[in-house]
Amino acid sequence: MYKQGEPNLWTGRLDSETDPKKFRHFQTVTFEDLSKLEKSSTPSGVGILGYAVDKGVALNKGRIGAKEGPDAIKQAFAGLPDLNQCETLVDYGNVYHDHEELIDTQKEFATLAAKSIVNHRQTFLLGGGHDIAYAQYLATRKVYPTQSIGVINIDAHFDTRAEQQSTSGTSFRQILEEDENTGYLVLGIAQGGNTQSLFDYAKEKKIDYVFADELLSHVSPTIKDMIERFIHEHDVIMFTICMDVIDSAFAPGVSAPAVLGLYPHTVLELAKRIIPSDKVSSVSIAEMNPTYDADNRTAKLVANLVHHFLK
């Protein structure tokens, strides 16, 4: 079920009503009905769409609450300064789960997300469970029907479980099994968060991955080269971040809190190797769970990541 954006989420400190250099995002955001959006001749600005769904998390036996993530992130983002002076910033609202099967919600989200990708230079998709990634893939493939898609996931988990239905832990297996014209790179894998069968599947499918232990102090030249090579090998890049990759000291409000997770600045450094590429079609950020957040710490962290990602 799709609902348009809520203007009352977008509030903040008012420094000026006339000087754009003093504006914050809540002063520049607009709201549109994405279901009625016509294709523009030239992509411009930024589109934001929320995936207010945690059904996939529940099916994956995780902590529910991530369906409240998109609105919490938007509220935190609203008060940040508009340093980039975005040509357009549109909140398209959220998609909610009201179908019998999760896959139907993912398809509904994909149809809408594809419209944002076509119309904007940057599209941010805010979760919600990491089943958002499969919906993001469907949207990407809709926009780019024949191109090779490189999926880059900053995550503690492979999320390549074999299940009978779509969950927050199956997205990337679904992608790889359904589409031979895709590749998968995972940055931040937790050795204690993945079974041997998942490592075996990664070997079988030639999944590139980097352990969290390799990213604790800095991003090495070898890893930078791996990222650049992966981007070069694909026509389109689908970029996604699962917030459970970040140590719970910094990101307590997630579906599965990380032990020995990454530092936020490491995630930011990794993302800055990816975001500048013109091949990036969209960015999703998943598993922000306000139920377990402390002082809005995780919501603010996601908001600031998006703020840094703006071109």
Curated annotation (Swiss-Prot):
Its EC number is 3.5.3.8. Binds 2 manganese ions per subunit. It holds the Pfam family Arginase. Mn(2+) 1 binds at residues 130, 155, 159, 242. Mn(2+) 2 binds at residues 155, 157, 242, 244. It comes from the Bacteria. Belongs to the arginase family. This is Formimidoylglutamase. The gene is hutG.
